[in-house]
Structure formats: C-alpha cells, structure tokens
Amino acid sequence: MLRFCAAALLTLLATPGMALDEDFLVIAHRGASGERPEHTLAAYERAIDQGADYIEPDLVLTRDGVFVARHENEIGQTTDVASRTEFADKRTTKSIDGVAVTGWFAEDFTLAELRTLRAKERIPAIRPANARFDGLYPVPTLEDIVRLVRAKEAETGRRIGLYPELKHPSFLQRATGINPADHLVRELERLEITPQDLVFIQSFETWVLGRLDRLSEFKLVQLIKPDGGPVDEPGVTYAEMVTPDGLAEVATYADGVGVNLALVLQADGSPTSLVSDAAQAGLVVHAWTVRKQNAFLPPGLREGEDGAAVGNYAALLAMLESAGVDGVFTDDVLPTICALGDEANNDDLWCALLSRDQARLPMPRAEDVVE
C-alpha cells in the first residue's frame, strides 16, 4: 500500500495547477462510477459529458454469448438479482480463477433475463449519493455502449475512446465454449469499430492478448497487479513482468501496460523505474485507479477520519503526472480533469462547482431510463 507522508508532497503542491500533457489520457473507470452506478449507460454518458478521453467497459458473457458490461461475472454486488425470486435457483458457488465465489453469474443468464435486472451502487457506504440511482439502469451490452459512443461523437464532434477489458477469459471460455478474443474481434467488426478508432483492449491474461495480437491491429494493454501473476501462466509473476526484460517480453504482443498505482509510485511518493523502463520497451503506461475518497487514498493524502470524505486526490494526480504516466483510470472524471488542468476538456463552471455539494448535471427521470 502507498503511504505518502505530508513532507513528500510539498514540492508537488507548491503550484495549484498542473500543465497537462496533451497526450495524457483520462480513462473513465467503469464510466463516471464515482457519480453513477458503475457500468451503466448513465455512467458512461456522464463521463463523456465531463470530458473523458476513453470509457472503460469490463466485458463478460451471457449464456447466449452476448458481451455485457460488468466488472466481474458475479452480478450480485452490482444488480438487484438477489431480490428477484424468479432467479433464486441460479445462485451457486463457482471457482473463478482459483477462488470460490458464491452468487449469480452472468454466464448463467440469457441476455433477455439480464435485461430485466437493474444496476445498483457497489459501495453505498462510501458513495451514498450513487444509491439514489439504484434500480434505474439496466445492464448494457457492448452494442449499447458502442451506439452511445457513436451518438455522443455525433453530438459533440469529438472522438471518444473505448477501453474494454476481457474479464476472466480462461474461465469464460471453459464455461461458455466461446473464445472471448475471437468473439470480441467479430463483435467489433460487426459494430464497425476498427483499429483506426480510439480503442485499447486490456486483460490480465497473456494468452488472450497474444490471440488478439494475431487476430487484429487493435492496441493492447497488459494489466499488471502488485502481486501474484497471470492465472493462465502460473510460472510467471507480475513482479517479473515489470522488470526491463519482462516489459520487453510484454512489448512483443502489447502496446502498453495498465498498472496498479503502487507499481508507479514508491512509499514516499517518488516514482519507481517502471515508466522509464516501459518507455524503453516502447510501451505506454496507464495507472489505476484514482478515486477521491479517503478510503482509497494513501494515509498521507487523507483528510480526516471519514473514509467517504474527499481527500487530497489532486496530490496523487500530481505525483502520477510527475512520474510520467501516459494516463490514469479514474472513477472521478471531472475532479481528475479539473485537478490536472486539462484546458481542452474541462469546464470552468463545472470545476468551480466541485467544492459545492450539488449535482452538476440534471437528475434523470425514472421514466427516461427504465426500459
């Protein structure tokens, strides 16, 4: 865990704003999930409206082979399925990447069944305001998300990036009989998404990225945690992956690495060698995940004892920018853009309202969002 001390922040905080590199990417982690339930069209649209460069849908498969957006294939934490008596018999326990998980799983539902569910906030104790949207939004498909992106591109006149992650591809291939890499390439082609669009495809598993590298020209990102290793390569550790030799190997099939913040910043807030080592290998570095609440910040950046209170996320962003990362995944798109001083994307009024306890976009009506 990162444990920054206050003294380490002084030089970074001497100036209130940062000059943002125009190539620095703000990636909406599960959409604007700090303000709407994650992986809903409402979260993605809000992120786009707030200026995100990319939106990030995590993809799992339904029983009938449709990609839908959920952070994991167990859907009990983020939908109302537990309250739906007609699906009670679908509750089960599975071994997902070696871990026993009990709940309801996307691959056991048809798309028609999933369409009847509604999303809910994952962490209401930390983000209670998001819980007011519980029950409003359905689970979107990849096609729904692409249609939203195309509509917002037409509306705004700017290009909007897609940054999908294939979740648990080895498990889902065994469970569904569908190769997620092949299926994703076919789906993107069907939806007229090409490598000329703004697309990164990410995964923790190496085989699926290698397969995508052989099948397509899409940009690929190897996800890397601080510990453990890819489930498809038990003899390989993530620690080995972030060495110069490991990064050179990653560069044979991927264009970048998506890494935990702890792999970019040392305990005192100074940068590790990862960014420079990745650059030597020709890889971009996107760091995850920036969240504004104390519960997710290093102790030295927390303000008060309340985990739900907003801490000094701007200092964390300053450190990441100083470390030279090429972009960040964030739940909090507008605060991130404002803190980074992204003049191309931010709105001065919205940024001014960040210090006020009020919504910055109109509250949707239930009849507008419930299908």
Over which residues does each language-model region extend?
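Sec-dependent signal peptide recognition
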Residues: 1-7
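Hydrophobic h-region of N-terminal signal peptides that target proteins for export
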Residues: 10-18
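Phosphate-group recognition and catalysis centered on beta-loop-alpha active-site segments
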Residues: 17-371
